[in-house]
Every structure is written in C-alpha cells, then in structure tokens.
C-alpha cells in the first residue's frame, strides 16, 4: 500500500484515556474535517523510527508529532516521498491497481477543524501550492511498514479537542449544505511552509481561518501555515456561522494589492471625484479650471457673507471668494498657472520679463521710499562728535585740512548715492554704461538736494550722508560761498513742506533724466515717465483737487535751481584744483572732468 508520510514523525501514541473518543460518530456533511485514507486492506499499525519534533526543535514539549496521509492501493512497499505532493499524487494515480476514491475516504491527522468537501467546486487548482505559486515542501523518506494510528479526527496530539461556540455554529451551517452529488472530485492538496516565527500556543489562542490561509499552531514558538484553495470560505463576520458565508466574494486583485481608497480620490477643495493633481493639490476638473481662470484674469471676488461660506460639491459655485480662498488654503500654487502669453508653450518661460514686477504706481512709490530711508542716516545715529557751534571765523585762505574734509564728504556721499540708485526699480535693468553716466552726471545735484533736505538751516546744522553733523562755520572755509547757497536752497525746500514719498520721487527724477551720450535713451525715458506719473498721483492725493497742479509745478521748479547749484559746485572744485593744496580723489576728479559744460 503506498503511503505518504510527513517530513517528521514519531511513533503512534499509545492507547490511553482518550480512546473512547475515537468512536465519536461524524456527520456525512463533514462538520469536522475528515480525510480518511485508510482502506480495509490497510496493514496493522506499525511503529516508526523517525525522530520526533523535540529532536529538531529545542524546548518543544507538545504532542503534535505527525501529519499523515494514506491512500488506498495495492499491497506494495512504501515508496519514497522525496518528491513534491503533486508528483506523489500522479504516481499513485498511474498505479495499475489504483482505483478512484472519494473525498470522504480521506483523513488528515492534525489540527484542521473545518469543512473541506462542501465547496469543492470553488477549488482553483489541483494543488493549493499551485494556486499560491509556491512549491510543496518535500517530505522525508518513508519508513517501511509504517501505518497511521486509528484516531478520531478530533482526537489530535494535543489531547481531546472540544469545539468552541464558533465551530458549533459551523456544525449547524454544514448540516444545511446539500450533499455532494455527481462524479467524485479530486481533492486539493496542502502546502506546508516552514516555521515562520514565535506564536502563541493552540491552548492559549483559538484556531482562526483567514480567506485563503489556515494556521496550525504547533507550540509557543513554532507554527505552520497551510495554504488552501477555498477563497470562497472567507468569513465575512467575526463568527463563521454568519449569514453571508456562502456569498462572500473573492477579493479582487486591486483590493489585495492595497489600492488607495477613502479620501485619496477626492478633491481637496470641494470633495468631488479627483483623478490627479492640479497645481500641486489633488483637485477635480471644476476647481482646477476655476483656479486657473481666477489667476490668469487676476479676478477679485467679494464675499457677501462672513467669508466662511461652505465649499462642497453642491455649494461650491455660491461664493467665488471663499472657493478661491480654500484653493489657496489647501496649497494650490498660483505661480504654476501659465499666463496668456505662455499658452501652448508648456515648460518654457520667457528669458526676461517685458515689465518689471514693480510696475504699478503703488509698488513703485513704496520701493522709492524704502530706498530713500535705507540710504539716509537715522536720527538716533547722528554723529555730533565734530560739531562745534561756536567757531571763530577765519578770514584767511583755506588750509589743507579744510580741503581734505571737503573731498572726504564728497567721496563718502558718492558711495551712498550709488547704493541708493541700485535700489530704484528699473535702474538695474539699464546698461552699465548708462548707469555710470547717469550717476556721474547727477552726483552733485543729488548731493545738494539730499543735503538740503536733511539739514536744519535755521540752526545752521548740516547733516551729511554718513550721519556727520557740522555747523555752517565749520564748512565755510572748505565749501566757500557754495555752502551758503546750499543752505538758502534748503530753506526754500523746507518751505514747500515736502513729505518723504514726494521727495523720494523727486530724487529719482534728478537721477533718471535725459543725458547726452545715453545708449538706450528710450528706456530711460520710459522709466522717467513712470516716476513722474507716480509723483503726480501722490501729489494729487495729498494736496487735494484745488491745487495739485500748483504744488507739482513748484516742486518740479526746484530742478532748475539744482542745475545752477551744481554749476557753482563745479566752480568750487575747479578753484581747489588750482590751489593744489590737496589732490582730489580720482573719483571726484573724474566726475569733475566729465561734468564740465565746456
């Protein structure tokens, strides 16, 4: 009789107090799993000499030692079971004396309490290992004259097994199943996987059946996983006797692969269906188009409520303001939206914008004011260390110290004015040659204008760009009569009560103006018109309707006075060069030579 033997086995257990359970009658519907492979021709049980589990697993003290299968056949010596389960079944089938057998004739010795013959029509393959794509583990060589013990299917190696309430419900369910009819179906074999890791013992945790896998607990540290081909037996509730047992669907491949579910396919703005991300956030096509149109048209919305309107699939079109604010709140990026000039040019940006970002008058005025404040000394940082109010007048000629002080004040102011000019919007976009030409041509005018605006002519105080404060008498010998003209201009400028924004625009107009030798005069003219428009709007807003034109004309009338004072300053530098007491700095000498009107 051919036999199939598990890889490890021990002698059959001796009769004991559990023998009376072996005659427990079983129902024909297989309420308990039975796979009886014994036949009337089976030889008497013979002991085996195979090693037990305790030989291979340290600390194992359980009684689960054998897993036996037996098929009826002719009286032949036990064949070696070194091949896989599929090859063993085929060899048994080709035996000349083998006959067809029924599934009821199978018997499994081990822990597998569950119906096996009812839903055989759901078997997906002839072998459970073929279904899961893993080969069966090869059993160990057989032992001659080994016979399986005649035990009850529910009398396992762990002692008497009393079904739990769950399996009592399973018994009631299996009794209602129709009996199998028709031709006998070949059984599905099992695939034994090696121990995977520690797990609680069978006595501590009940046996659980999963959709396609049943786990037999062998001990506190060992377990075997038995793959089955009955996915239709997957429980749909914590109890196996639930009403949906037979109708439990086989999980689809998408569900088994962990496909995204829940809110991952919902629009982050309104909750509608969303297939992919738009502008950095998963949104629906409606919210994507709404956000795109709003950004491209630079639309401005107004909420008629309290700016907290609900935005969902049904009410998303009620308040455009709240919908756009929610688009921004969930993380949609406005900079990603292509403008009208970029339509059809996916992935490409213009090399240089046609218009600087600070094109609006409000932004331009803010930038001019910020540049002016950053370039001037604060009141708290004024330097009075050299200030002397009582100074005896010197009627003689100037000495070298006075001339050196004059040159130092000019060169120090030039660096401050250069940094201020670089912060004017649009000035950095000009060519380097035009930038240098505008700075050198307007330097003396800017020096006079800024000094006159900061100084206090009533007190005779002159406040320079570095924060140094000097009295008028301290500058008389170095500046000559030019200092008196500067103070007179300062008094007239203060009489106009010019605020900081208007003065910032006026200073920029002194720098950005037409000069002889410009490479790009058109760009300079465009920038000048923008600054003039900004100044006009500011004066109109501050002065009011009755007299905006007169205020603007009086303010612009100071520009010709600056040209006259600039010529007077060039004459003073020319006079000091002739005296040759101190050589002028190279930058001052260059400015003097380039600015001469002749």
From Swiss-Prot:
Gene3D superfamilies the UniProt entry points to: Erythroid Transcription Factor GATA-1, subunit A (3.30.50.10), Retinoid X Receptor (1.10.565.10)
Region called Disordered, residue ranges: 1-50, 120-159, 341-361
Keyword annotations: Acetylation, Cytoplasm, DNA-binding, Inflammatory response, Metal-binding, Mitochondrion, Nucleus, Phosphoprotein, Receptor, Transcription, Transcription regulation, Zinc, Zinc-finger
Domain NR LBD: from-to ranges: 360-595
Record PTM text: Phosphorylated at Ser-351 by RPS6KA1 and RPS6KA3 in response to mitogenic or stress stimuli.
Start and end residues of each stretch annotated as Binds lipopolysaccharide: 521-544
Region feature AF-2, mapped onto this chain: 584-595
Residues modified to Phosphoserine: 341, 351
Chief location of this protein within or outside the cell: cytoplasm
InterPro entries named in the record: NHR-like_dom_sf (IPR035500), NR4A1 (IPR003071), NR4A1-3 (IPR003070), Nucl_hrmn_rcpt_lig-bd (IPR000536), Nuclear_hrmn_rcpt (IPR001723), Znf_hrmn_rcpt (IPR001628), Znf_NHR/GATA (IPR013088)
Region (Required for the interaction with RXRA): 299-361
Annotated region of DNA binding: 264-339
Annotated region described as Required for nuclear import, given as residue ranges: 171-466
Cofactor notes: Binds 2 zinc ions.
Keyword S-adenosyl-L-methionine: no
Family: Belongs to the nuclear hormone receptor family. NR4 subfamily.
Record remark on domains: The NR LBD domain binds the lipid A moiety of lipopolysaccharide (LPS) in the cytosol.
Summary of subunit composition and partner proteins: Binds the NGFI-B response element (NBRE) as a monomer. Binds the Nur response element (NurRE), consisting of two inverse NBRE-related octanucleotide repeats separated by 6 base-pairs, as a dimer. Interacts (via N-terminus) with NLRP3 (via LRR repeat domain); the interaction is direct, requires binding of NR4A1/Nur77 to NBRE-containing dsDNA and lipopolysaccharide, and leads to non-canonical NLRP3 inflammasome activation. Interacts with GADD45GIP1. Interacts with STK11.
Alphabetized PANTHER family for the sequence: NUCLEAR HORMONE RECEPTOR, NUCLEAR RECEPTOR SUBFAMILY 4 GROUP A MEMBER 1
Full protein name: Nuclear receptor subfamily 4 group A member 1
The organism of origin for this protein: Canis lupus familiaris (Dog)
């Amino acid at each position: 009789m051919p036999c199939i033997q598990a890889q490890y086995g021990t002698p059959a257990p001796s009769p004991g107090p559990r023998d009376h359970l072996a005659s427990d009658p079983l129902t024909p519907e297989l309420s308990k799993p039975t796979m009886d492979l014994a036949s009337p021709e089976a030889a008497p049980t013979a002991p085996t000499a195979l090693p037990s589990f305790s030989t291979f697993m340290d600390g194992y003290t359980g009684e689960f030692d054998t897993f036996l299968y037996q098929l009826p056949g002719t009286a032949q010596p036990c064949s070696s079971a070194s091949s896989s389960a599929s090859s063993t079944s085929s060899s048994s089938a080709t035996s000349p004396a083998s006959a067809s057998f029924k599934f009821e004739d199978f018997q499994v010795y081990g822990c597998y309490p569950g119906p096996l013959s009812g839903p055989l029509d759901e078997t997906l393959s002839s072998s459970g290992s073929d279904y899961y794509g893993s080969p069966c583990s090869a059993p160990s060589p057989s032992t001659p004259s080994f016979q399986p013990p005649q035990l009850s299917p529910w009398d396992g190696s762990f002692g008497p097994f009393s079904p739990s309430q769950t399996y009592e419900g399973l018994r009631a369910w299996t009794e209602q199943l129709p009996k199998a009819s028709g031709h006998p179906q070949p059984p599905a074999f099992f695939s034994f996987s090696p121990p995977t890791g520690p797990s609680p013992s069978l006595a501590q945790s009940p046996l659980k059946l999963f959709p396609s896998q049943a786990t037999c607990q062998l001990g506190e540290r060992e377990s075997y996983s038995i793959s089955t081909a009955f996915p239709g037996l997957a429980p749909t509730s914590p109890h196996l006797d639930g009403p949906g047992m037979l109708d439990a669907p086989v999980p689809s491949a998408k569900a088994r692969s962990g496909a995204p579910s829940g809110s991952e396919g919902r629009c982050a703005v309104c909750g509608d269906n969303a297939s992919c991300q738009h502008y950095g956030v998963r949104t629906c096509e409606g919210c994507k188009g709404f956000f795109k149109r709003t950004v491209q048209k630079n639309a401005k919305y107004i909420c008629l409520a309290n700016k907290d309107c609900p935005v969902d699939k049904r009410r998303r079109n009620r308040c455009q303001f709240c919908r756009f604010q929610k688009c921004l709140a969930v993380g949609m990026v406005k900079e990603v939206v292509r403008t009208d000039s970029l339509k059809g040019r996916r992935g490409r940006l213009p090399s240089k914008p046609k218009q600087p970002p600070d094109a609006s008058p409000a932004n331009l005025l803010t930038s001019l004011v910020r540049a002016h404040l950053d370039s001037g000394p604060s009141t708290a940082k004024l330097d009075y260390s050299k200030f002397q109010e009582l100074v005896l007048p010197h009627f003689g000629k100037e000495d070298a110290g006075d001339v050196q002080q004059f040159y130092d004040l000019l060169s120090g102011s030039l660096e401050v004015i250069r940094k201020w000019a670089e912060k004017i919007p649009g000035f950095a976009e000009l060519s380097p040659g035009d930038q240098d030409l505008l700075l050198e041509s307007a330097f003396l005018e800017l020096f006079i204008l800024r000094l006159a605006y900061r100084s206090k002519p009533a007190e005779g105080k002159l406040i320079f760009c570095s924060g140094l404060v000097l009295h008028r008498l301290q500058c008389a010998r170095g500046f000559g009569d030019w200092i008196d003209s500067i103070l007179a201009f300062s008094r007239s400028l203060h009489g106009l009560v010019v605020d900081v924004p208007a003065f910032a625009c006026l200073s920029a107009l002194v720098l950005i103006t037409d000069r002889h030798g410009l490479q790009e005069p058109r760009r300079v003219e465009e920038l000048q018109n923008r600054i003039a428009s900004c100044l006009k709007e500011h004066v109109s807003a501050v002065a009011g309707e009755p007299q905006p034109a007169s205020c603007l004309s009086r303010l612009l009338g100071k520009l010709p006075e600056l040209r006259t004072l600039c010529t007077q300053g060039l004459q003073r530098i020319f006079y000091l060069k002739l005296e040759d007491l101190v050589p002028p700095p190279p930058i001052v000498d260059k400015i003097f030579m380039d600015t001469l009107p002749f």
